[in-house]
Amino acid sequence: MAVSSAFVVTPKLEKLLANHHNPTYSSSPAPLDVIGIRALPMNNRNKRGLIQRARCEISPSNKAASISALEQLKTSAIDRYTKERSSIVVIGLSIHTAPVEMREKLAIPEAEWPRAIAELCGLNHIEEAAVLSTCNRMEIYVLALSQHRGVKEVTEWMSKTSGIPVSEICQHRFLLYNKDVTQHIFEVSAGLDSLVLGEGQILAQVKQVVKVGQGVNGFGRNISGLFKHAITVGKRVRTETNIAAGAVSVSSAAVELALMKLPESSHASSARMLVVGAGKMGKLVIKHLVAKGCTKMVVVNRSEEKVAAVRNEMPPGVEIIYKPLDEMLSCAAEADVVFTSTASETPLFLKEQVETLPPVRDARLFVDISVPRNVGSCVAEIDGTRVFNVDDLKEVVAANKEDRVRKAMDAQAIITDESKHFEAWRDSLETVPTIKKLRGYTERIIAAEIEKSLPKMGIDMNKKMRKTVDDLIRGIVNKLLHGPMQHLRCDGNDSRTLSETLDNMQALNRMYGLDAEILEEKIRAKVEKK
């Protein structure tokens, strides 16, 4: 968008321009001497800003040309922030890009999501944010004023909260922008990006992001709209492609893996099973064990309530024995297979504890599907002990994947269609600031003209007469604005109409100098937030 050269550079905007030309930023503009202004070093003692100092360097002989160049500089700097809208960005690490050792350090418990959103939105170039943290992925979704600076700030925030160096995060992270973000979250919600293709639990986790985000300031219109649309896509894909039919879940894959690793002389009905944790994942482990023929197992949990609820869902003949958490180690001493799926942020089984357990006939199996992990990595060093985590489930998943590849192709067609709808909706939001600013612009003119005209009328007008004059002026202005306003409204469904609407918006921004106001409002919001 072009910006009128007549706009006034206010202190906040001047500060932004000064920062924008600070050499510490990697996205620095072209050298100022190219346009006839000598670049001067920035320092904290001089608060008058780049533009003030540049103005002092204008020689009398080149004054006119330099002023023109200065206006170009102002305009180009503003353009950098207003020509393109804020970007939706995802900075993520998943089972496809990072090991569980890293993911568990970055994991953010659900109860901490609102705090994380608030901290992310406190960063200079972040307007909105959401966190999707599961056993297979840790992804930060943001609306960023600047792609490069937004990514830099979020990556540094991730490093600070996890203790992982920025360089290491950069080696394993993936970055996606705008349309690619839309494609990605839709694939995630549909189960296409899961280790277990088509699994349904991820859709519930995406729903939880929206549920937790409701009422959180930083979970704004763009990001919330993205996640809500992702839920719609996830439901549609599962309904129209039946991709979840026959799909294994992480829990069922864990059970399959355990049975694969049991010695030939053992099977589900004879092996002694222990399940630690009776949450969603633990409940599914129990159900899959029963489906495989296991009729007796011990379940360790903080409270008996959840275990009793699971027990009531089991068929006759299945014995589920509840044990409190403080008896976990003694229960493990009598188990051949230990499944762990709790929300604990520290390991429940450490090497020094497991070393004290009596040996079993072949090897004691620990199948840990928690992130952060419930079983310390050093436990695998103990003789007669084998440890598996979520990254080891790929062996099971590979055998189950082929028959759903075709359904995944059908799902991609749905995702492509829904992505177009979402991007069109987001494009239609672009005109909202212009509509608000144009309305505010006319309101200021109306108020100023009424105040200026009333004394000239030479009469003391009562409230009723004043309201009549006010309504008359507003009626005239509203009729004049009706046409422009109609040409700024679009639902985003028709690409041709949308393109025309955006052209109209840019024209009005140029005519009334609204770009600078819109930018200053963003800056003001950031300053007030801090």
UniProtKB/Swiss-Prot annotation:
The keyword Cytoplasm does not apply. Induction: Not regulated by light. Up-regulated locally by wounding and reactive oxygen species. Not regulated by methyl jasmonate. SUPFAM superfamilies: Glutamyl tRNA-reductase catalytic, N-terminal domain (SSF69742), Glutamyl tRNA-reductase dimerization domain (SSF69075), NAD(P)-binding Rossmann-fold domains (SSF51735). Expressed in roots and flowers. Detected in leaves, hypocotyls and cotyledons. NADP(+) binds at residues 277-282. Residues 1-64 form a transit peptide. Disruption phenotype: No visible phenotype, but decreased heme content in roots. GO terms for biological process: chlorophyll biosynthetic process; heme biosynthetic process; protoporphyrinogen IX biosynthetic process; response to oxidative stress; tetrapyrrole biosynthetic process. Substrate binds at residues 134-137, 194, 199-201, 205. Pathway: Porphyrin-containing compound metabolism; protoporphyrin-IX biosynthesis; 5-aminolevulinate from L-glutamyl-tRNA(Glu): step 1/2; Porphyrin-containing compound metabolism; chlorophyll biosynthesis. It is found in: Plastid, Chloroplast. Pfam families: GlutR_dimer, GlutR_N, Shikimate_DH. Keywords: Chlorophyll biosynthesis, Chloroplast, NADP, Oxidoreductase, Plastid, Porphyrin biosynthesis, Transit peptide. Its main location: plastid. InterPro entries: 4pyrrol_synth_GluRdtase, 4pyrrol_synth_GluRdtase_dimer, 4pyrrol_synth_GluRdtase_N, GluRdtase_CS, GluRdtase_dimer_dom_sf, GluRdtase_N_sf, NAD(P)-bd_dom_sf, Shikm_DH/Glu-tRNA_Rdtase. During catalysis, the active site Cys acts as a nucleophile attacking the alpha-carbonyl group of tRNA-bound glutamate with the formation of a thioester intermediate between enzyme and glutamate, and the concomitant release of tRNA(Glu). The thioester intermediate is finally reduced by direct hydride transfer from NADPH, to form the product GSA. NCBIfam families: hemA. This is Glutamyl-tRNA reductase 2, chloroplastic. The gene is HEMA2.
